């Protein structure tokens, strides 16, 4: 049994003893033995004992109760009015008894408060113990679940590793086969060394000629493989995020071996400064560049770098300028006859993109529109040194409806727009003067293409898309006849 319950039992026993003693002793003290059922104020009494004299106003009235409605012991003594008789021995004894009863009642109240406090403490401790017991059960169940999960994970891992057993067996067999091949190659090498010693000088020269002939045929084959029909464009590769919404960037397809400079031109008009980065890595990771100031501002985003020179359209004119980047001098200027300029025949996105210069495997090109061709696209093959037009083709595609354009292997490819979903849907073959509508989608990742050019060295499309410099790899389809080898 808990401590609070023991204390409550002691209190109730003490109260019962006091009540019994008072009911037997008080009447004998005052000389009365009358029993009466009554009620006390402040609560309903289960049992009351009254001591009533013949004249209640001149004597004591004592009431005792086992408990009230709240479970507490009530002892009440009503003193009579003071008279000369109150000084007798019995009155003195009653007063002393009253003081004892009052002291005992106060002690009982203190004991009751302590009991209530201890009971609350025990209940609190009991709740905490129940909480700890629940937590221990949860920890135990969680531990079991954790072990089960670990077991399942190990079992799943074993199931994943099980298929590797036959692979390991095959690997062992392949290792033996590789050793066997190695021995055979060593034997073959020794045989070839013996044959080389037996072959004379004449036979060696004949073999060398055959090898040279084969190299020439392979080189011709590679040249044919360099050109083909566009069949696919890869997902974009973001190289850098820099500059305004409009601009152009490029590398030189005829740069010396080992040189990989990047040229960067922000904005589409009334700007003269060209940034030169030493390498693609510098362009991607640093802001270390050399600045070149052009003698005239450019127009549009159709500039190209070709064989050490930059070709651009002079602002508010149809003049093309060739500027040497090494000596920083103008090498040649020429007017592109009848070409529209100053936003007369721009691409769909605007931006003074009337004249677009391009480079492919065949050299330098200019794409523009004229009044004579009703604003439709015109293609001119240019001499890179003199800028003279070598040959011109008139197409039936309106230049203002084109999003952007680029040339691969002499074929002009035109996109249907510059924002949102974009695709290449028109192709004009200059070698046959024919065109066709195609459907080659590509991802317009940043929703605003203002420059799209092909680089034959990298076989990739360079694009400026809403302040992002990106690359697209291209897939070309080749058809080579056996008599061409």
Swiss-Prot record:
Glycan-linked positions: 33, 103, 187, 288, 307, 394, 431, 473
Domain Olfactomedin-like: 226-478
Keyword tags: Cell projection, Coiled coil, Developmental protein, Disulfide bond, Endoplasmic reticulum, Glycoprotein, Secreted, Signal, Synapse
Coiled coil: 87-225
Chain's role: Contributes to the regulation of axonal growth. May play an important role in regulating the production of neural crest cells by the neural tube.
Keyword Disulfide bond belongs to the record: yes
Keyword Signal among UniProt keywords: yes
InterPro entries: Noelin_dom, Olfac-like_dom, Olfactomedin-like_domain, Quino_amine_DH_bsu
Major location (coarse): secreted
GO BP annotations listed: atrioventricular valve formation; cardiac epithelial to mesenchymal transition; negative regulation of gene expression; neuronal signal transduction; positive regulation of apoptotic process; positive regulation of epithelial to mesenchymal transition; positive regulation of gene expression; regulation of axon extension
Post-translational events: Glycosylated.
Domain comment, as recorded: The protein contains a globular N-terminal tetramerization domain, a long stalk formed by the coiled coil region and a C-terminal olfactomedin-like domain. Interactions between dimers are mediated by the coiled coil region. The dimers interact mostly via the N-terminal tetramerization domain, giving rise to a V-shaped overall architecture of the tetramer.
PROSITE patterns named among the record's database cross-references: ER_TARGET, OLF
Biological classification of the source: Eukaryota, Metazoa, Chordata, Craniata, Vertebrata
Disulfide bonds: 227-409
Subunit structure: Homotetramer; disulfide-linked. Dimer of dimers, giving rise to a V-shaped homotretramer. Component of the AMPAR complex.
This protein's name: Noelin
Record GO cellular component, one term: perikaryon
Compartment annotation: Secreted; Synapse; Endoplasmic reticulum; Cell projection, Axon
Pfam families associated with the record: Noelin-1, OLF
